[in-house]
Amino acid sequence: TVTASTTLNFAGAGTATITNLNGTAPEAILTVNRVASGGASLSTLTLNGAGTFNGIISLYSNTTGGSQNNILNLNHAQAAQYATIKLGGYGYTTGASVLKAGVDTSISKLEHNNAAALITGEGTTLTITGDSSSYGGSFGGTVTVDYTGGGTFTLGNSDKNTALTPAASPNATLKISRGTLSLFSGNVTWSQKLVMGDGTTLSIQDGPSVTGYASYNATSVNSGG
């Protein structure tokens, strides 16, 4: 049970498993920090059971060697259903944080830290249910990230002039079932599948041009920007 802000430091390779991550503490931050340098060894925190924690799970890979070496594996449909997940890392080539949907699962909110982040899974869906979310990282594998919150999902870097090029598999999908997809950083090169639900909105903010392609399965998609 997490009732106050706590830090879990990984100094080397290995896996830590929490069966039920519980705690009613929306201001609490569980920081999972990769602090080792060098190598491509992986540090993994696996959540194996249903949890009630409604604070922030913050992953940051503060390493100067290796890659994708700080992993949060959600291995239950309700492992982090009420939590906010914040992802970031030193850099894609030197250390990134990874959110893995080991099964179909849900979280409340996704929070932008920086671009060195990856959401991945194989044939699984990560559903985001909260009012708003933001993300500046990549999508990998065959994961589907489905935003159902009805508010705004912001995709892009905090600096509109900084390019966002998701280093991801073309088989990954970002789906907006309800609400608005806002491309905050206009400089986006898109290679994933983008699915917009009926009555959703695609908003392109001021910034450089957007390139790539999108395939809509909706009968009605609004646009603005």
How would you name each of these model-derived features?
Residues F10-A11, T31-A36, V145-G151:
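Parallel beta-helix/beta-solenoid
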Residues G121-G130:
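Short, surface-exposed polybasic-and-hydrophobic patches located at secondary-structure transitions
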Residues T1-V2, G12-A28, L42-L118, S132-T142, ...:
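Surface-exposed loop/turn positions within long extracellular repeat scaffolds
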Residues T105, T124-T125, Y147:
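Polar, glycosylation-prone regions of secreted, cell-surface, and some intracellular proteins
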Residues R34, G39-A40, E122-G123:
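Short, charged low-complexity linear motifs
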